[in-house]
Amino acid sequence: MTADSVVLRRCHSIEDFHACVALQREVWNFTDAELVPLRMFVVADKVGGQVMGAFDGDVMVGFALSVPGTRSGHVYLHSHMLAVRKDHRNGGLGRRLKLMQREDALARGIELIEWTFDPLEIKNAYLNLEKLGAIARRYNINQYGITSSPLQGGLPSDRLIAEWWLKSKRVETLLATGKNPPIVSESSIEVPAQIYDWKAAPETRSKAQQVQERNREQFLRAFSHGLAVIGYERDAESNGKFLLGHWDEKWSYASET
């Protein structure tokens, strides 16, 4: 597989949506009750959402699903799910799918895409903040309840809300130069690289929960003081660090929850 062999396109057919459901099961190993059903993909396509697929030949190897929302009279997109097959990861495919979402949103006059992500997932946080230019200033505790996915490790499904302001200086500078604008970090929140092993093993899961609870408190306190997540660092040992400070741009919709 090469990056050039994977083609991205909109999904509109029932066959495409069946492939999305199957890939979702493969990636997260959800129970049937927790899968986003085929009908939801159909609805998203019909009501102004996005179902973007990535295909290696005839085989779907990734997809992105979003649904439209409104806040204070502004239309935005909530990107609910992005999946990439294991053998196609770490090659930039997730970022390509997000950029396809951005292109489509801007063509329709939409300036904001949001999504949730697990703050314990180091690679995903780095993609969202450093490769896409999202920020975060909201934190939801146990948003989806305890799920059956092994990736969650039986922990509460705490989530940061990524705000991707598509026409912000931060995003446009990153896409034009490959670098985010300089930031002033006022505090940081750390995630140890061992978090994946700790979540996977019942005997060490309490360590992962301690990290989650400590970081939850730090995020909530920082956000209550007007700080935002504006950067992310990884060190040579793959430990992660959220960088928090005051975001100097004024993009916001009122009544954000």
Question: In which residue ranges do the predicted regions lie?
Answer:
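Conserved catalytic-core motifs of GNAT/GCN5-like acyltransferases
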Residues: 116, 126, 133-150, 231-234
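A conserved beta-strand-loop-helix scaffold within acyl/acetyltransferase catalytic domains
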Residues: 6-84, 230-236, 246-249
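C-terminal "cap" of GNAT-fold acetyltransferases
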Residues: 142-175, 245-254
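A conserved beta-turn-beta hairpin within the catalytic core of GNAT-like acetyltransferases
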Residues: 69-79, 89, 111, 184-188
